[in-house]
């Protein structure tokens, strides 16, 4: 028996064997959907909006012509009002019962219940007009001195309809209702709620509104700014920021909003600044003269105002960087970006944590600041409010120019001193002076983290600032918080191309290598590989410290190997000078050959070999034993050891054959096209076709192992070809009556290959997905035919799987056809060749005929379906391979811990029945965000007992590179628990990463890691 379960993630429907029986399924094809789509949809809407029918008792019984449209057409004949001239909506009802206090209370309770339960999804135009008209009538019936809560709830219902409008006509009708009702409203509570409802509609559906309606809504909100309610003013500013057009915002609304920056209410001041920011973000040009108002607002007593003012200062500084600001107390003038940078730096001394964090984050975005102001952020010397100190010559010249005389020995020594304003004097450093240092020394980690990030952004744009800030970033390695240390490490990695490390800086960095956190150690390995050192002594310090830490933390070998590889590539001349010392080569005596499996010796070899790639004379310094070790490491670690001209390095015959063919082809892509052309020729043959296809399959597999960039594409085609070969082999069994039915394992392998194509590959275009779905449809049809022929198992499950797969591909084709009709025509010359080919892909004749036959079956029982599709399955031509798509990536995993080399030697011993914790580390490439929830860790014991572990989402962390976080490559670091009853001896336990694509079926992403596990009997006490 079988149960059809529809998977939430994905578009296909799977079948799980062994479940209770369910009702028979019928294929819903394009014709069936088109025939019954309307009725089902209307029923769905009626079910969702039935609750609004309860309002009829409060609206009253209207005569047929009572509700008149602007054009004079009764609603009874149209079913809904039409949108027309604003200000002439449908007239209010006249036959409603009088509204008493009890009725008002009942109506309010009913509206609250409806608001909580109603769903607006898939509302048709006619239904929406009818419901909106009903709400409008009920609103008109409410007296102005009655309870405002009813009108507020009615506006909420109306805004809910507006947020789900699918057409411009329906949306403009809702906006007409809002404008008409709010112009006549006098209650500030209702006006404030109406403004908020318009803002919500603008967030969801503003792109559908015509410009004229946007202007009218913004003008309505502008009128409400004169309201005496602060709540109404705030919501009106929200509406202006959302609806005002770019040109209208610059001409009419900017200065109107700027007027309210001086409002008595702090929330109004903050909202006015926020509305200006919203207009600026939407493209309106904010005038530079607003800068002075924003600076004054930064001194506000309320945090919300200072926060918005700080962002406005930042925006104005970046929008008008070269605008010259006059200075009252100085003769020289400042650029606005420099003045804004100084004000943002001052905010780093604010009492509020949120403002200090925001100021530290904004500093990184002001890259146009002058060099002098930027470097002042790292100098804590006290300055006189950023006033430039004048030389004695300049001061004397100024006295002479003044023409004043004094009785003393100096010019103007009796002149009155400069008048000092008490507010301009600051005991601490002001302006940009020492601002980043204050941020790095803040007591809260959020400020320190933001300051480190901003320092990194500024250093990336200014190489001279990167050199100056290096010492301060290195000091952050000693921070007490791990996240701050990691941020400093990754920031230094990003600016590594601009700096060269000194010996004193290396001492602090290398001291952090002994950190207990594995993330910090791996981050330091990445950073050391990206940086450059200045001397041989520094290089020896780094290498020796890495080897010492590797002996202490052997689990860091992979990141240490990668670090040694990068160091060798960046310092070939320094490595050449110390290579003899690192390899213990004596000038007179022959040293003993070292163990090639020693991790420390491996690190040195990786360092030397990668340096020799850029400086070939290093090879002459290597002893003979090292040449043999190179041949071994080149085969075992090809990603860490480069190709070198060393004699004795052998290669396998298959590799040599593929390499020579690729060399003749010119590139991997050309060689792949050559393989695909050969496969097309093979499909035209009749004799020995399977053997040739298997040879092409091995060539595709080998191509992916040689060229990492083509791995996803070649593996996708190889898996597709493997499924084709399996289908062709099973098709021969279905062609004759006497043929032996394949085993269940063969059918399961075919279905597994189809699932791999569907779930482990990303970057597929429409043509690739269509070919995969057609392949799965063929596999399901063949599965049903073979199961019915076998007669030893139920065919209900395969039959349902075939119907569901056919329905899935039918919906997929229908959806793509609908999208193509809605898209505007595209000029073929502007479209890439691959995209045009994939978009024009059509299902083959087998798929079309099979869908037609399944659609014609009224009662799809397995026997009848079998008889209908048997001729098609027996005569099905081979399915063409999809064209090569270089954007395809495959999700693969590599288990780092437990290590296969050490797990055979270290036996995990535990008392039987108790739990042993085993660290588990794996790197997963090309993992989509939606696939993280489907990741599983499968543990298989020697007695074939298995259990599956679901890792936590927090255990997935992106892999860091020199360019930052990798988008699709993640590292899974967790702990798995092993437990079992007593065994006689230690046995292997297999640990594997899988992707759960359907209940009871997982796709393996890597080879299993094996650990020796020995549960011992419990010791009995005396």
UniProtKB/Swiss-Prot annotation:
Highest taxon, organism lineage: Eukaryota
Single Gene Ontology BP annotation: RNA polymerase II transcription initiation surveillance
Main subcellular localisation: nucleus
UniProt-recorded Gene Ontology molecular function terms: inositol hexakisphosphate binding
Residue numbers spanned by region Disordered: 818-840
Keywords: Nucleus
Family per record: Belongs to the Integrator subunit 4 family.
Name used for this protein in its record: Integrator complex subunit 4
Organism per entry: Drosophila melanogaster (Fruit fly)
UniProt gene name: IntS4
């Amino acid at each position: 028996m079988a149960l059809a379960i529809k998977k939430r993630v994905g578009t296909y429907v799977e079948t799980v064997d062994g479940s209770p029986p369910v009702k028979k399924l019928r294929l819903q094809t394009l014709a069936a959907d088109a025939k019954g789509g309307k009725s089902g949809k209307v029923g769905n809407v009626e079910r969702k909006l039935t609750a609004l029918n309860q309002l009829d008792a409060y609206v009253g019984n209207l005569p047929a012509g009572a509700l008149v449209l602007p054009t004079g057409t009764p609603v009874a004949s149209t079913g809904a009002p039409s949108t027309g001239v604003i200000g002439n909506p449908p007239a209010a009802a006249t036959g409603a019962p009088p509204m008493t206090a009890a009725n008002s209370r009942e109506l309010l309770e009913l509206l609250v219940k409806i608001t909580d339960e109603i769903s607006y999804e898939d509302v048709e135009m006619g239904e929406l007009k009818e419901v909106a008209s009903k709400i409008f009538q009920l609103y008109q019936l409410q007296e102005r001195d009655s309870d405002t809560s009813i009108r507020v709830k009615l506006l909420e219902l109306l805004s809910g309809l507006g947020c789900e409008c699918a057409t411009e006509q329906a949306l403009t009708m809702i906006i007409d209702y809002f404008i008409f009702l709010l112009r006549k409203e006098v209650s500030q509570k209702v006006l404030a709620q109406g403004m908020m409802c318009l803002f919500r509609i603008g967030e969801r559906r503003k792109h559908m509104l015509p410009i004229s309606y946007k202007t009218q809504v913004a003008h309505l909100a502008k009128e409400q700014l004169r309201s005496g309610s602060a709540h109404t003013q705030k919501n009106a500013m929200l509406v202006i920021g959302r609806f005002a057009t770019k040109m209208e915002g610059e001409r009419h609304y900017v200065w109107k909003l700027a007027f309210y920056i001086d409002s008595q209410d702090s929330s109004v001041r903050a909202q006015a600044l926020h509305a200006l920011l919203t207009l600026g973000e939407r493209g309106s040009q904010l005038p530079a003269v607003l800068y002075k108002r924003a600076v004054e607002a930064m001194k506000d007593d309320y945090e919300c105002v200072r926060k918005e003012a700080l962002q406005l200062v930042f925006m104005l500084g970046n929008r008008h960087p070269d605008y010259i600001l006059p200075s009252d107390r100085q003769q020289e003038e400042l650029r606005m970006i420099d003045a804004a940078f100084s004000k943002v730096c001052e905010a780093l001394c604010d009492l509020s944590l949120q403002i200090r964090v925001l100021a530290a984050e904004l500093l990184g975005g002001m890259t146009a600041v002058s060099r002098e102001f930027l470097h002042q952020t790292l100098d804590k010397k006290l300055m006189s409010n950023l006033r430039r100190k004048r030389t004695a010559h300049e001061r004397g010249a100024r006295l002479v120019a003044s023409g004043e005389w004094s009785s003393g020995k100096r010019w103007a020594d009796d002149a009155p001193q400069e008048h000092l304003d008490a507010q301009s004097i600051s005991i601490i450093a002001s302006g940009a002076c020492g601002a980043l240092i204050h941020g790095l020394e803040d007591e809260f980690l959020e400020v320190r983290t933001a300051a480190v990030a901003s320092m990194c952004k500024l250093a990336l744009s200014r190489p001279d600032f990167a050199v100056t800030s290096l010492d301060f970033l290195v000091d952050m390695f000693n921070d007490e918080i791990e996240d701050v240390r990691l941020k400093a490490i990754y920031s230094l990695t990003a600016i590594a191309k601009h700096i060269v490390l000194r010996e004193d800086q290396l001492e602090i960095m290398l001291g952090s290598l002994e950190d207990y956190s594995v993330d910090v150690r791996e981050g330091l390995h990445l950073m050391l590989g990206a940086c450059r050192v200045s001397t041989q002594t520094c290089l020896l310090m780094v290498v020796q410290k890495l080897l010492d830490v590797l002996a202490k933390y052997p689990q860091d070998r992979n990141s240490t190997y990668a670090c040694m590889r990068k160091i060798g590539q960046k310092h070939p001349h320094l490595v050449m000078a110390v290579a003899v010392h690192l390899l213990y080569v004596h000038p007179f005596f022959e040293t003993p050959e070292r163990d090639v499996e020693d991790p420390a010796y491996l690190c040195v070899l990786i360092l030397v070999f990668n340096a020799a790639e850029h400086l070939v004379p290093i090879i002459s310094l290597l002893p003979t034993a090292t040449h043999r070790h190179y041949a071994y490491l080149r085969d075992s670690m090809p990603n860490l050891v480069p190709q070198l001209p060393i004699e004795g390095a052998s290669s396998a015959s298959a590799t040599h054959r593929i390499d020579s063919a690729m060399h003749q082809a010119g590139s991997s892509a050309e060689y792949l096209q050559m393989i695909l052309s050969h496969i097309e020729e093979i499909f035209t043959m009749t004799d020995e076709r399977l053997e040739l296809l298997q040879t092409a399959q091995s060539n595709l597999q080998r191509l992916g192992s040689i060229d990492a960039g083509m791995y996803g594409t070649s593996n996708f085609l190889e898996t597709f070809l493997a499924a084709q070969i399996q289908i062709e082999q099973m098709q021969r069994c279905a062609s004759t009556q006497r043929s032996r039915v394949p085993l269940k394992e063969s059918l399961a392998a075919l279905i597994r290959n189809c699932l791999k194509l569907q779930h482990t590959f990303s970057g597929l275009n429409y043509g690739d997905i269509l070919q995969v779905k057609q392949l799965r449809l063929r596999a399901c049809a063949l599965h049903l035919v073979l199961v019915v022929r076998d007669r030893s198992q139920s065919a209900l499950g395969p039959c349902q799987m075939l119907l569901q797969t056919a329905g899935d591909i039918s919906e997929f084709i229908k959806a793509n056809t609908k999208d193509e009709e809605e898209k505007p025509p595209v000029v073929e010359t502007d479209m890439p060749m691959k995209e045009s080919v994939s978009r024009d892909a059509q299902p083959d004749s087998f798929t079309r005929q099979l869908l037609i036959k399944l659609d014609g079956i009224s009662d799809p029982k397995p026997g009848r379906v079998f008889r209908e599709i048997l001729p098609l399955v027996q005569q099905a031509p081979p399915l063409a391979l999809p064209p090569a798509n270089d954007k395809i990536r495959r999700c693969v995993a590599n288990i780092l811990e437990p290590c296969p080399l050490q797990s055979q030697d270290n036996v995990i011993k535990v008392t039987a029945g108790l739990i042993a914790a085993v660290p588990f580390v794996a790197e997963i490439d090309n993992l989509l965000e939606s696939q993280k929830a489907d990741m599983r860790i499968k543990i298989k014991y020697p007695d074939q007992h298995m259990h599956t572990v679901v890792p936590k989402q927090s255990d997935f962390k992106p892999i860091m590179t020199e360019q930052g976080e990798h988008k699709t490559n993640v590292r899974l670091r967790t702990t798995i628990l092993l437990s079992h009853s007593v065994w006689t001896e230690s046995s292997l336990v297999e640990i594997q990463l899988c992707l759960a694509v359907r209940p009871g079926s997982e796709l393996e992403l890597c080879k299993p890691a094996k650990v020796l596990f020995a549960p011992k009997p419990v010791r009995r006490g005396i």
